[in-house]
Amino acid sequence: MARIFITGSTDGLGRAAAQALIQKSHQVVLHARSSERAVALDDLAPWSAGVVIGDLSSATDTRNVASQVNALGRMDAVIHNAGAYSTKGRSPTPEGHPTIIAVNALAPYVLTALMARPRRLVYLSSGMHREGSSSLRDIDWSARRWSSSQAYSDSKLYLTALAFAVARRWPDVLSNAVDPGWVATKMGGASAPDDFEEGYLTQTWLAVSEAPAATVSGRYWHHRRPLPPAKEVDNPAFQDQLSARLADMTGVSLF
């Protein structure tokens, strides 16, 4: 059985993925943003391999999450499921970054760099990454007029490119991005039309399946089908420029 860490596992896709993996006797390490949010895991925690707590919008907390997971031992897979979408403006983090950018892009980058390297990495993307801006001059939105939807698209472009960069730079790791579709979660809303089950089962499939179709790297998946991502995602020059910018913003070097 595999050991899997899932960020953002108190609700939505992350919780569903955790439940599915626990039911198959995998060792799942859960994550909650705060002790208060961890109460939502009370029913799963006894069957899990541990619960780590930390707010991924905070650089300090994100580093601490990496330390907590490392203390539990090397994971076989990490599912970077946690995400944020805010319509309340830039919502700066303690370090001054927009919360959307911090949670959706900076935190997965830092966790990837600081956690013991797993065999598999799964990053939760979105079809909205195709509307992301390829300009990396104002990742922090310090000059642009704020747009939550554009910032979200940008963050998912960065995250998807990160998944492909890891696939290229770490050939011993299976790294993939997943578009779960527009599904009924707290973020997606109750009327979202896509298949919720396929949204989380694609994550778990990539995390643990030994099927030949799942043991590949550098792919963008939607409901267990590979799709072409935005052109920037598979561009080594863009990947390297993004990695350099994220290293500069976080003070953490990945490659």
For the regions a protein language model found, what residue spans apply to each?
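Conserved N-terminal Rossmann-fold NAD(P)-binding element of oxidoreductases
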Residues: 4-8, 31
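Catalytic loop of short-chain dehydrogenase/reductase
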Residues: 83-92, 98, 120-172, 179-192
